[in-house]
């Protein structure tokens, strides 16, 4: 299953607020479609599936990518769910979004893919790059790159920059000072349900 490129509000009407996907809020609270307003009891599988879809759409990753992250999270020490969220939060496109360099995660991914972002002084155009404590994330030192980031910083997608990201707005640069904290994950998610969803599939 490839990355979603369709109408974003249709997704947020079904899954709720996804700050990484879009800034816009859905005007109608019920899911899209002919039977969207009908209330029916959801199965446990449907609830787990919905939580999994929230992660996929918020972080803008494919099913195959998410499966890889689940496997990697399982192989690490500690809670698989927390490890999974940290892996997604540490993606370069998400870090740029959390810093305000991009309006959304897809917008931040474009910045990265087009070579506007450097990691430790080197242009890095891989959106899935795993950022770590000590890394310095910065906007490339040219006029076009700086204008893009400065425009986005005036109206950031999220109000607060997580405390482990030390942002210098004048230099358009930030240092990752610590590991990601579960508390600062912006999306409302029950990661344990995502782990349960994949328990028999991966």
Curated annotation (Swiss-Prot):
GO terms for biological process: ribosomal small subunit biogenesis; translation. One of its GO terms (cellular component) is small ribosomal subunit. The keyword Ribosomal protein applies. Residues 90-152 form the S4 RNA-binding domain. One of its GO terms (molecular function) is structural constituent of ribosome. Keywords: Ribonucleoprotein, Ribosomal protein, RNA-binding, rRNA-binding. Residues 1-43 are annotated as: Disordered. The keyword Ribosomal protein applies. Pfam families: Ribosomal_S4 (PF00163), S4 (PF01479). InterPro entries: Ribosomal_uS4, Ribosomal_uS4_bac-type, Ribosomal_uS4_CS, Ribosomal_uS4_N, S4_RNA-bd, S4_RNA-bd_sf. Residues 1-13 have a biased composition (Basic residues). CDD domains: S4. It comes from the Bacteria. Part of the 30S ribosomal subunit. Contacts protein S5. The interaction surface between S4 and S5 is involved in control of translational fidelity. Belongs to the universal ribosomal protein uS4 family. One of the primary rRNA binding proteins, it binds directly to 16S rRNA where it nucleates assembly of the body of the 30S subunit. This is Small ribosomal subunit protein uS4. It comes from Prochlorococcus marinus (strain NATL1A). The lineage of its organism: Bacteria, Bacillati, Cyanobacteriota, Cyanophyceae, Synechococcales.
